[in-house]
Structure formats: C-alpha cells, structure tokens
Amino acid sequence: MSEAEYLGGRLLLAMPGMGDPRFDHAVIAMCVHDEHGALGIGVGHVREGITLHGLLEDVGIDPGLAPDMPVLNGGPVETARGFVLHSDDWGGEGSVTVNGLCCLSASLDILRAIAEGRGPSRFVIALGYAGWGGGQLEGEMRRHGWYAAQGRPEILFETPTGRRWTQAWKREGIDPAHLVGQTGSA
C-alpha cells in the first residue's frame, strides 16, 4: 500500500456478517496503519460495569471535575490498558495526532488533567485496542470484513456511542439497512 492508502484517521466500520462476534457493529478509530500493522480504538460499544469515575478511582485519581461517563470497549487486545481519544486542545507527553480525526493519549497525565478540569474539551476513554499484524487488516478488507469510512470528529465526539455505526454509514451516503452479510462472485 502507498502512504495515501493507509487508514490512519479513518473509521473502520464492521461489515454485517464479518464472522467475528467481538466486532459486531464495531466502529474502530484507526490511529496507526502502515506496512508493519495497524492499531485502532473501538468507539462503538460501552464496556459494561465501568465508568470514568470508577476507572479514575481504580488508578488512584480523585474523579474531581471529571464527568461520570461510560468507558468504551476499545478492543480485544490488552483490555486493561487505557486510551483517550481527544480533541487537539490538550497535549501532553506522548500525545499523538491522528490525521485530523483526533489525538491519542495513553498516560495518567491526561486522566489527571480531566479530573482537574484542565483536560481536552472533547474526549472518549476506552480500555483495550484492536491490532493487526502487517498485511492482516488488508486481508480482512479484501474479504469484506471492514469498510473504511471518513474519519469524522462529530461521529467520534458528538454521536451517542450506540448510534455511531449507523450514523457513520449514513454520513457515507449508505443506508446500513441495505447491507447484507454475504458476498458473492460472478
């Protein structure tokens, strides 16, 4: 793939019938994608039983001014590792800009900043990530497992979690009710 074809900054949308129940109706914010592999954070499903306040308390941070919002299921890899996708109005050590979609931070500094009311204006927090080895994601896309939608910050930050998959399809001009779970060949 050429650099222009890599998917960093895009939203991966799981196709119906992709065959992996962990990714049913998944929306993955693609953070890194190159010849060595890919890493994305799931933003389409809530991690049951944990909120931001609980997460902050678990890592020894007083929730303070942080909203008590749901924590997302970022993916099946390193499910105890936290990630914050956020607006570019906050930057700390290790923050990475993701091609116009958002910034990615994974340090306790951003959690402290959020709790103290000096964090980014918009953010989502997830535990875990989705990862692919070199060429693996491309193979899954050839088998019609994923659709690469435009990375739209309004889908990430303004659309309710449970509606992100449907709304991302609609913003692409596709009615997801017309998608089928099987592909064919002529």
Swiss-Prot record:
Gene Ontology cellular component list: cytosol
Recorded superkingdom: Bacteria
Q: Which Gene3D superfamilies match?
A: VC0467-like
Q: Pfam families recorded for this chain?
A: DUF179 (PF02622)
SUPFAM superfamilies reported in the protein's UniProt record:
VC0467-like (SSF143456)
Give the InterPro entries listed for this entry.
AlgH-like
Q: Which protein family is it in?
A: Belongs to the UPF0301 (AlgH) family.
The name under which this protein is listed is UPF0301 protein Saro_0683
Coiled-coil annotated spans: none
